[in-house]
Swiss-Prot record:
Primary subcellular site in the record, as a coarse category: cytoplasm
Protein name stated in the entry: Isoleucine--tRNA ligase
Location in the cell: Cytoplasm
Protein's organism: Bacillus cereus (strain G9842)
Taxonomic path: Bacteria, Bacillati, Bacillota, Bacilli, Bacillales
Protein's gene: ileS
Cofactor binding annotation: Binds 1 zinc ion per subunit.
Enzyme Commission number, as recorded: 6.1.1.5
Length: 921
């Protein structure tokens, strides 16, 4: 007889190798055929809603690792919620207007100057749709389950119509106004920019100290002094109309040789050192408030520079006397307005100085720095010129520096509802908690929102102008434009004349001749995506406002979190979200930002082609995503190894359940041995821990709990000793069926627990599980932890056993290294335990050979009675010797019972019995 044929070895067709790059696309096709998204919605119908609202990625180019991190995190949450009593629809979106699409077309050779705006916009729309399609396929490849056939896209007519309504509601409440004001201006884009469209980069700039002679001292100054200002933007000096000082600061009049200078007293030493003053003496001090309305002379133009008070003046740098150009700075503008100064802005859309800057007209602003500095030197006003490298705002798209420039723009008045915004921030749950402080401070400190852009590709600002220049925004015009956009799309604005966009028979007192013109500016793209709570959450039947969660990168505090909050509070008085969760950026393995120049860009597609989507998803679950995260080949290799262990666990479980029918073979919990019940306690602990971690979005805790359970609880302990029973005993032996009962519970629970993170693998495992009826594991619920009546006692006892087992394993390892034994089945062990361990060992003595995977086990005396040379550990002393007897051909246990059965001379007594009872006819 071939005894190896009598062993019940694992048997399964579940493949050992994942081969995910090939197998996942096939699984996704299967999901598409069975309409998995709709099936899940149907399955969860009638449950309470959980809405995670997708912040729309920008439709341009392939998805990057930041996109992958974001979408996969969202997918974890939505999948988990749909398995825990919620209906969790997920509608993906795309942001499709804006400059990058215009630039992409120009780069492709589109001659936009040779076509109408409407024609150019049609090309923009076509390009945007192509990009949506490209990204949609890449997101699907990640295994993200979403309503991919019905996304929201910001260029779609229904969306644009709702955006117009949001604008109209805000205008009706008086929150929209037109004003001349300095805004971030990009000369390279020739447009205003929102705060969210700028990024800071290092820039080399001139740093100059300039003297402004006093013209009228107002009886506070004698008239022979000079104010010193410091600036890094010499090109703004032609626009200088004043000098700001702080009312509470003390200022010194400092005599240096024959000159007298005015600076903040606190900065005396710094300025003296920088300007290399020797023998400088303070002849007088005055309070900043006393200097108000004194007048200085502009250094090279024949005009006054008024001295004003401003709280924005600090002593962090400079002189405490701040050059003030109301056309080129927010603080300058506010102070200038208070003192009635004009808003002088001698720079055009392209960043070129105009004839309002005599002597420098026609120069690009950056090129004007040198001649202006030379002019200052010529007139004796330049006290010092150096160069510094400092952090300076740049256009996030063109990567070129931007300027502050006063222009006529449309604004949303944040000031009008700032109090409500701050309250809404306080009512929202923020994860991480610092998000609340971050957005609170932004909302508290931000100026009004410049919502107009001087571009072609976007949603038009729905304003008309009467003959007398009055802007027209009424309920009637807004509703009519919204209806037109819903029917024809926003291109209709560029295809028709103003009168054809107005309601029929529309009149206005400012247009006695019935003539009107339309606004040519478009809305900031942040107004587009910021209106999604109205256009998507409110409009779609399967969603609701407020959403339960917004989840985006930490750059969205100033972006989508902010713009959505502003429009929602303006329109509804409430935040559009109940909770906000943010994640960090993806860096390379060394913690560097990914960039083409370094050549360290990791692309999701490459990972999926080489390793698979589930490996990428497992990486997402492994990182502390609330901070910046790292990815590299080495990191992915480690993750792939963890995946291999999880997959092998599934394969082992399936292999040992091949002959198990739950309905026929399952053993009642009360009839299980203690060690089996202990395993169920460990499983229930895992279920509790993993579900709590999912609830708090702590996916790294899920990852570690599942990995540890597979490697420590299962592989290193339960499955290791169970092999002796699973393979060796007869198919229906009660201990074997008991272990299979536990393995079955473990398999079903583990498959469900990993589903949100490893959906492809979970759905690959699912049909192999005996007795399952559901088409997909996604149509099931998370396992419930079952509290065993003796769970605490089992845990106390068996946790203690596990620590003692560690001592035994160490002793066996030492014996192996000293060549006392080969493998552990060659060993006979005698334990000399502590008093508390002795009673525990006596209660489970019959299982101990199997639990320690040795051939012979004896209980000696107490620990103090152990032989002097026996290794002593925390809980026991252990004597390891070679087991006596011969090795059984079938189970490899060393036994003195070999050959006792004459028919089976090479088998131990146990194996001979099993063979006779199960295999001998």
């Amino acid at each position: 007889m071939e005894y190896k044929n009598t062993l019940l070895m694992p048997k399964t067709e579940f493949p050992m190798r994942g081969n995910l790059p090939k197998r996942e696309p096939a699984m996704q096709e299967k999901w598409a055929e069975m309409n998995i998204y709709e099936k899940v919605q149907e399955h969860t119908k009638g449950r309470p809603l959980f809405v995670l609202h997708d912040g729309p990625p920008y439709a341009n180019g392939d998805i990057h690792m930041g996109h992958a991190l974001n979408k996969v995190l969202k997918d974890f949450i939505v999948r988990y919620k749909s398995m825990t009593g919620f209906s969790a629809p997920y509608v993906p979106g795309w942001d499709t207007h804006g400059l990058p699409i215009e630039q992409a077309l120009t780069n492709k050779g589109v001659k936009r100057k040779e076509m109408t705006v409407a024609e150019f916009r049609k090309l923009c729309a076509e390009y945007a749709y192509e990009q949506v399609e490209r990204q949609r396929e890449q997101f699907k490849r990640l295994g993200v389950r979403a309503d991919w056939d019905n996304p929201y896209i910001t260029l779609e007519p229904a969306y644009e119509a709702q955006q117009i309504k949001v604008f109209g509601d805000m205008a009706k409440k008086g929150y929209i106004y037109k004003g001349q004001k300095p805004v971030y201006w990009s000369p390279t884009s020739e447009s205003a920019l929102a705060e969210a469209e700028i990024e800071y980069q290092d820039k080399k700039s001139a740093s100059i100290y300039v003297a402004f002679p006093v013209k009228d001292g107002k009886n506070v100054l004698e008239g022979d002094e000079k104010y010193i200002i410091w600036t890094t933007t010499p090109w703004t000096l032609p626009a200088n109309l004043g000098i700001s000082v702080h009312p509470e600061l003390e200022y010194s009049i400092v005599k240096v040789n024959d000159e007298k200078y005015i600076i903040a007293s606190e900065l005396f030493e710094t300025v003296a050192k920088t300007l290399e003053w020797e023998n400088a003496e303070v002849v007088k001090t005055v309070k900043g408030s006393e200097l108000e309305y004194t007048v200085a002379k502009h250094p090279f133009y024949d005009r006054d520079s008024l001295v004003m008070l401003g709280d924005h003046v600090t002593t962090d740098a400079g002189t405490g006397c701040v050059h003030t150009a109301p056309g080129h700075g927010e603080d300058d503008f506010v102070v200038g307005k208070k003192y009635g100064l004009e808003v002088l802005c001698p720079v055009d859309d392209k960043g070129v100085l105009t004839n309002e800057a005599p002597g420098f007209e026609g120069l690009f602003y950056d090129k004007a720095n040198k001649p202006i500095t030379e002019k200052l030197e010529e007139v004796g006003a330049l006290l010092k010129l150096t160069f510094i490298t400092h952090s300076y705002p740049h256009d996030w798209r063109t990567k070129k520096p931007i300027i502050f420039r006063a222009t006529a723009q449309w604004f949303a008045s944040i000031e009008a509802f700032r109090k409500e915004l701050i309250e809404a921030v306080a009512e929202t749950k923020w994860v991480p908690a610092w998000g609340e402080t971050r957005l609170h401070n932004m909302v508290r400190d931000r100026g009004d929102w410049c919502i107009s852009r001087q571009r072609a590709w976007g949603v038009p600002i729905p304003v008309f102008y009467a003959e007398n220049g009055d802007p027209i925004i009424t309920d009637e015009t807004i509703n009519h434009v919204a209806d037109l956009f819903r029917e024809h799309g926003s291109n209709v604005w560029f295809e028709r004349e103003a009168k054809d966009l107005l309601p029929e028979g529309f009149t206005h007192p400012g247009s006695p001749n019935g003539e009107f013109r339309k606004e040519t500016d478009i809305m900031d793209v942040w107004f587009d995506s910021g209106s999604s709570h109205q256009a998507v959450l409110e409009e779609r039947e399967d969603l609701q406002r407020p959403a339960d969660l917004y989840l985006e990168g930490s750059d969205q505090y100033r972006g989508w979190f902010n713009s959505s909050l502003s429009t929602a509070v303006a329109v509804t008085g409430k935040a559009p979200y109940k909770g906000v969760l943010s994640h960090g950026f993806v860096l390379d393995g060394e913690g560097r930002k990914m960039s083409k120049s370094i050549g360290n860009i990791v692309v999701p597609k490459k990972i999926m082609d080489q390793l698979g989507g589930d490996i990428l998803r497992l990486w997402v679950s492994s990182v502390d995503y609330q901070s910046d995260v790292r990815i590299s080949d080495d990191i992915l290799k480690q993750v792939a190894e963890v995946y291999r262990k999880i997959r092998n666990t599934f394969r082992f479980l399936l292999g040992n359940l091949d002959d198990f029918k739950p309905s026929e073979n399952a053993v009642a919990v009360a009839e299980l041995r203690e060690v089996d019940r202990y395993m169920l306690v460990k499983l229930n602990d895992l279920i509790t821990k993993v579900k709590e971690a999912y609830e708090t979005y702590d996916f790294a805790a899920v990852y570690h709990a599942i990995h540890n359970f597979c490697t420590i609880d299962l592989s290193s302990f339960y499955l290791d000793f169970a092999k002796d029973i699973l393979y060796i005993e007869g198919a229906n032996h009660e201990d074997r069926r008991a272990i299979q009962t536990v393995l079955y519970d473990v398999l079903v629970a583990l498959t469900k627990l990993v589903t949100p993170i490893l959906p492809h693998t979970a759905d690959e495992v699912w049909p192999y599980i005996p007795g399952v009826t559901e088409e997909s594991v996604q149509l099931t619920d998370m396992p419930e932890a079952v509290q065993l009546y003796d769970a605490e006692a089992l845990k106390t006892k068996w946790d203690a056993f596990m620590t003692l087992r560690d001592d035994v394993l160490k002793a066996l390892e030492v014996a192996r290294n000293e060549k006392v034994i080969g493998k552990s089945l060659n060993a006979s062990i005698t334990l000399y335990p502590t008093a508390e361990m002795k009673a525990m060992l006596e209660s489970i003595s019959e299982d101990l050979k199997q639990l320690f995977i040795v051939s012979e086990y004896k209980l000696g005396g107490m620990m103090e009675e152990a032989p002097a040379d026996a290794p002593k550990y925390e809980h026991t002393a252990v004597v390891v010797a070679q087991a006596t007897g011969e090795t059984c051909e079938r189970c490899w246990v060393v036994s003195e019972t070999i050959g006792k059965d004459a028919e089976h001379e090479t088998l131990c007594e146990r194996c001979a019995t099993v063979v006779k009872e199960n295999y001998v006819k």
